[in-house]
Amino acid sequence: MQQIMSQIRAAVDSYQLIQSGDRIAVGISGGKDSLVLLCALANMRKFLPMKYDLVAITVDPCFDNIQTDFRQVEELCRRLQIKYEIRRSQLGNIIFEQRKESNPCSLCARMRRGILHDMSKKHNCNKLALGHHFDDAVQTFFMNLFYGGKIGCFSPMSYLSRKDLYLIRPMVFCEESKVESAAQRYHLPVVKSECPVDGHTCRQSTQELIKDLEKRFPDLRRKVMGALQRADIDGWGKQK
């Protein structure tokens, strides 16, 4: 976890993601990324110069109208002394039964994020932290290029004026392999995704493509990240 926290600190310093007095909602999907982020931010409160509060929030899509079991995540939050709220929803039913979406991931992400925004404001948070990591950023760059025909990526930090809420991604310098290792080493209670298309998404296909490309172009992911920062695409140019 030490390396993860060091890389989070680098992102926090580079993009001024956290300031003293912040109240941060951490979006918890139950996956390894969000759980590692939660634990890291909780531990970093002990030594970061800025003082901040944390709340954990989850949107349960209730796929097949079945509530996901988050009891082990609740226990983790109790140990960390972090308030935790689960919002049960009908996202699974809306996306797969009512709308029958051909591209369900995009709609699900938008709807889930909208609920997370509302939950963040309910808990008087001024920031929402999501667990997107280094590899997510590189994959998003390629997905925007291949599927959207544009150069772009999500931002390390963005401001949602309609909600008066900052969206931050403190793990953008953390490689997925290191995140996975941390989750395993600390026996974090990862919740298996029940999404019907899990493992068969555009992001999964893009991830496999990047692996193939790196056989011919070593260090491709690092070069993409460097390009995002040097060109200051979508706020990736380091602030200091």
Identify the role of each PLM range.
Residues M1, A109, G199-C202, T206, ...:
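Generic structural signal for well-ordered, non-membrane alpha-helical segments
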Residues M1-Q139, Y147, S177-R185:
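ATP-dependent adenylation/nucleotidyltransferase module used to activate substrates
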Residues P61-F63, L91-N93, S158-S161, C174, ...:
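Residue-level detector of flexible, active-site-proximal loop/helix-junction positions
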Residues I95-Q98, C202-Q204, I233-D234:
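Short, solvent-exposed polar/charged micro-motifs at secondary-structure junctions
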Residues A109-K121, M157-K163, I210, E214-Q229:
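Short, basic, helix/turn surface patches
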Residues K127, D135-K215:
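Catalytic subdomain that performs nucleotidyl-dependent activation
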Residues T201, D219-K240:
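A short, charged, Gly/Pro-tolerant segment at domain boundaries
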